[in-house]
Each structure stands twice: as structure tokens, then as C-alpha cells.
Regions:
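Conserved Rossmann-fold NAD(P)-dependent oxidoreductase catalytic core, especially the SDR/UDP-sugar
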Residues: 10, 37-82, 108
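Hydrophobic positions on the long internal alpha-helix
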Residues: 35, 39-43, 95-96, 169, ...
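Conserved catalytic-site region of short-chain dehydrogenase/reductase
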Residues: 17-18, 53-68, 84-90, 101-102, ...
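Conserved cofactor-binding/catalytic machinery of classical short-chain dehydrogenase/reductase
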Residues: 7, 35, 50, 74, ...
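Active-site Tyr-X1-5-Lys
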Residues: 38, 62, 80-113, 132-143
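NAD(P)H-binding glycine-rich loop region in Rossmannoid oxidoreductase-like domains
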Residues: 1-32, 45
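Alpha-helical substrate-binding/gating segment
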Residues: 101, 115, 130-148, 158-175
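Glycine-rich "substrate-gating" loop/helix at the edge of Rossmann-like oxidoreductase active sites
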Residues: 81-85, 113-128, 152-164
Length: 175
């Protein structure tokens, strides 16, 4: 290979909010598995010293006890609205584990919670919860609407993490 990186961080992937996850199930599973598969295997070939991949909070069962424990992974059904994305992220994590065992690939899988920050997708239909709610609130305000549509039942607990905090966690994980 022309490049011999010291570290590879798989941050690429197809992401979206509830609407996008429900509508583009095949795209979410195919694109995310393809990205992870190609990069993980390239790291094996290049003998990359360190690889970080990302899982997702949605990898955990829909009815996992809160706060979620790492041990609850793969213990129950996933949230149907983002099952394809969750399965793709689980596949990436398991692939890292298998490549570590068989090929001694030095990898770690970080599982951040819901991210937000600069450059986010503020589309009310395809964005994640914080940016899409911000956009919907803004549109309601400028249009003088008295109501704001919020999707879901309101029952799920969510945690949020600013991308700068994730960056700090990545640096820590690499040390």
C-alpha cells in the first residue's frame, strides 16, 4: 500500500434520524457494512498499528435496563426504527473483534451516545434529534406556529455528547 498510517479512525458512515433510518433500511445496512469491511480489511493488509471504529448506542436492546450496561449488548431485540443501522454497527464491532483474534489487528470499538455539534444535519426530516428539533423550533417561531411536532413516544431516555468531547475521548483511547 502507498500509505502506512499509524492510526485509522472509521468515522465515515451513513447516518440519519428516525425518518431516514425507517425509509432507507437497505442503504443504511449496506453502506455501513461496506465502509467498515473495506477499511478494517485494508488496516489488516497495511498492518495498521491502531484502529478505532465506532459503534452506536442503538446497538443495545430496545428495552435494556437504564443506564445501559455494556453486558446488555446482544441480549434482546433492537429498536425497529434503526435496526439496520444497529446491525451494521454490531457487524463492524464483531469484525474488529474477529480481526483482532485472527490477525492481531489492534482495534478498539468506541460506542458514543447521540452526537451533536458543528456541521450537523439540521434537516427536520433526516437530522438527528437535537439539530432537527432546533430547526423545527426555529421554523415554528419564524412561521408563528403555536405547535411543534416532536416524533416518538417520549419514553426512550437519551444522552447527548458534543463532538468535541468525543474528540477528547478518541485522543484518550489512542494514548
Amino acid at each position: 500500500l502507498a500509505l502506512e498510517p499509524d492510526v485509522v479512525i472509521i468515522a465515515a458512515g451513513r447516518v440519519g434520524g428516525i425518518h431516514a433510518n425507517e425509509r432507507y433500511t437497505a442503504d443504511f445496512i449496506y453502506e455501513n457494512i461496506a465502509i467498515q469491511t473495506n477499511i478494517i480489511d485494508a488496516c489488516k493488509i497495511a498492518q495498521t498499528p491502531k484502529l478505532i471504529c465506532f459503534g452506536s448506542a442503538c446497538m443495545y436492546p430496545r428495552n435494556a435496563q437504564q443506564p445501559v450496561k455494556e453486558s446488555s449488548l446482544l441480549t434482546g431485540p433492537l429498536e425497529p426504527t434503526n435496526e439496520s443501522y444497529a446491525i451494521a454497527k454490531i457487524a463492524g464491532m464483531m469484525m474488529c473483534k474477529a480481526y483482532k483474534k485472527q490477525h492481531s489487528l489492534n482495534s478498539i470499538c468506541l460506542v458514543p451516545t447521540n452526537l451533536y455539534g458543528p456541521g450537523d444535519n439540521f434537516d427536520p426530516q433526516s437530522g438527528h434529534v437535537i439539530p432537527s428539533l432546533m430547526r423545527r423550533a426555529h421554523l415554528a417561531k419564524v412561521s408563528n406556529h403555536r405547535h411543534l411536532e416532536i416524533w416518538g413516544s417520549g419514553k426512550p431516555r437519551r444522552e447527548f455528547l458534543h463532538v468535541s468531547d468525543l474528540s477528547s475521548a478518541i485522543v484518550f483511547a489512542l494514548s
